[in-house]
Amino acid sequence: MAHVALIPGLSRGSVGAVCTQAASWGLKASTLRHLTLASIIKSRRKTDHLERTASVLRREVMAAAKVCEITHESPSVKSLRLLVADKDFSFKAGQWVDFFIPGVSVVGGFSICSSPQRLERDRIIELAVKYADHPPAVWVHNKCTLDSEVALRVGGEFFFDPQPTDAPRNLILIAGGVGINPLLSILRHSADLHRDHADKGRSYEIGTVKLFYSAKNTSELLFKKDILDLVHEFPEKISCSFHVTKQTAQISAELKPYVTDGRITEKEIRDHISAETLFYVCGPPPMTDFFSKHLESCHVPKEHICFEKWW
């Protein structure tokens, strides 16, 4: 896990129907405590999320959430939109949640892919979960339905949270597979910051943002329409380069200008190195290790390299 900054309030340790009103539901506090404590006690696998992230900062707030929309993002990935009524629940772009499921002893860990502003405005967060034999992923793909209730707790030291007085920074986002999730949150947050700055002139002034995103094929490039919508909305600020490693089908005319056959290369990343640029990397451990070490070998300061590995 990358260390970026300490956050006040943290402690260690198919499309559905329209969302209902936040105030109309909620797990009882006693039920919430029982659910989370039972999951923590039973979740003991050495490879599980809680053990891997035991030393990572977490917020103290444990919040109930209700599933209000389910979407197939790709053949192997489902996204969930969850309504979180608790106004004390918040997160930084790039963070993840401990995902507590009633009746499932193993705790999931899923990165948030929506922006903090979406939560503030609509009380909605979005997660994208790839199918695996891990119990939380099995539940998401096979048992989760509209109105399913879970509990969430925010954690993570990988985030982008500039303050209005901070100097503008360029961002290079390097994603592999479902590693796009926290980087999409950062991308969406950057777009929100740019809108606020253009409208009000008093929020953080974002620099340029370039996304490099690699997947097996274009059907596994998650949220590509949302990404291209941001590229088209802010052509002078946001750009993207999709990479596919095992493409067999024909690429659509709309997507083709943005797609490169083959992996993301060192040269592509090296060409964007500057004193004003921050690098965020998230993907399979070998990819994350490769690019973080490459950037260090190019004398990029360690404090400008933020990375997170997901298993």
From Swiss-Prot:
Gene3D superfamilies for this protein: Nucleotide-binding domain of ferredoxin-NADP reductase (FNR) module (3.40.50.80), Translation factors (2.40.30.10)
Cellular compartments per GO CC: mitochondrion
Keywords associated with the record: NAD, Oxidoreductase, Signal
InterPro entries listed in its UniProt record: FAD-bd_FR_type, FNR_nucleotide-bd, Oxidoreductase_NAD-binding, OxRdtase_FAD/NAD-bd, Riboflavin_synthase-like_b-brl
Enzyme category, top tier: oxidoreductase
Ranges where the FAD-binding FR-type domain occurs: 60-171
SUPFAM superfamilies: Ferredoxin reductase-like, C-terminal NADP-linked domain (SSF52343), Riboflavin synthase domain-like (SSF63380)
Keyword Transferase attributed: no
Enzyme Commission identifier(s): 1.-.-.-
GO molecular function: oxidoreductase activity
Residues the entry annotates as binding NAD(+): 177-182
PANTHER family, A to Z: OXIDOREDUCTASE NAD-BINDING DOMAIN-CONTAINING PROTEIN 1
Protein name as catalogued: Oxidoreductase NAD-binding domain-containing protein 1
Origin organism lineage: Eukaryota, Metazoa, Chordata, Craniata, Vertebrata
